[in-house]
């Protein structure tokens, strides 16, 4: 195999969480608090605004939410995260299982909490990763810091060139570049031209399907 270790993002790479949780909770909030704005946000437009200028700007500048209202919206999100398990993308479990069966290492580097990542893997019957770097680690070590990859290399006696990062967004790309690892953009979760254009221009690989990830790491 070309790579000895795959570092997987979680949201929109392994599980369809933006569509099923983040966007869904946002729409639920709007339906209750600002129903006239629901029509303004498709899933793709929501993801584009998350990419740029960012979710805080969306809430504060575009929707004009006060700090109190932002806290209220967050409660909707927390309720969805705690009570709903996002669906894993078809074929991702088989890739993880076969890669590990061949001696590969599967790591997760995500801005989700470790307990939710573990739950999602278990409920979707995915093989458990070897190590998880979630939101629980110190702030300075989270993506886009290269710390996760450097720690992996030390733990498993790897060089960065033996590591492939798979992520749908820029923090994962920045982490990979800072550590000297290759980066594959996970382009199967949504169709947002601005994100795709950026990722195609900067990534080592741009993958439009889980099947393409399989070809890259197993064939």
Name each model feature, range by range.
Residues 46, 86, 108, 162-164:
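Residue-level marker of alpha-helix boundaries and capping positions
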Residues 31-38, 102, 124-128, 157-158:
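Short helix-capping segments at alpha-helix termini
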Residues 73-74, 95-122, 132-133:
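Substrate-recognition element of Asp-dependent hydrolases with the DxDx(T/V) motif
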Residues 88, 109, 141:
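Residue-level marker of regulatory loop/turn positions in helix-turn-helix DNA-binding domains and
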Residues 2-94, 98, 115:
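N-terminal helical cap/lid subdomain that shapes the substrate entry/recognition surface
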Residues 14, 106-109, 165-166, 206:
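Conserved SAM-binding loop
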Residues 1-4, 114, 118-219:
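Asp-based, Mg2+/Mn2+-dependent phosphohydrolase catalytic module
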């Amino acid at each position: 195999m070309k790579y000895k270790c795959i570092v997987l993002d979680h949201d929109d790479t392994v599980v369809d969480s933006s569509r099923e949780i983040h966007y869904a909770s946002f729409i639920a909030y709007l339906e209750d608090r600002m129903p006239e704005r629901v029509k303004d946000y498709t899933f793709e437009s929501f993801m584009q605004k998350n990419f740029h200028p960012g979710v805080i700007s969306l809430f504060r500048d575009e929707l004009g939410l006060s700090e109190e209202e932002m806290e209220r919206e967050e409660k909707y999100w927390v309720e969805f995260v705690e009570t709903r398990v996002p669906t894993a993308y078809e074929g991702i479990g088989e890739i993880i299982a076969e890669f590990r069966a061949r001696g590969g290492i599967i790591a997760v580097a995500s801005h989700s909490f470790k307990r939710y990542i573990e739950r999602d893997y278990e409920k979707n019957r995915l093989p458990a990763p070897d190590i998880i770097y979630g939101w629980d680690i110190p702030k300075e070590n989270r993506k886009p810091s290269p710390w996760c990859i450097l720690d992996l290399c030390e733990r498993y006696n790897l060089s960065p060139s033996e590591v492939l990062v798979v992520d749908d967004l820029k923090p994962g790309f920045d982490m990979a570049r800072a550590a000297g690892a290759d980066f594959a953009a996970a382009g199967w979760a949504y169709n947002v031209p601005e994100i795709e254009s950026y990722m195609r221009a900067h990534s080592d690989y741009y993958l439009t399907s889980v099947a393409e990830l399989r070809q890259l790491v197993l064939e």
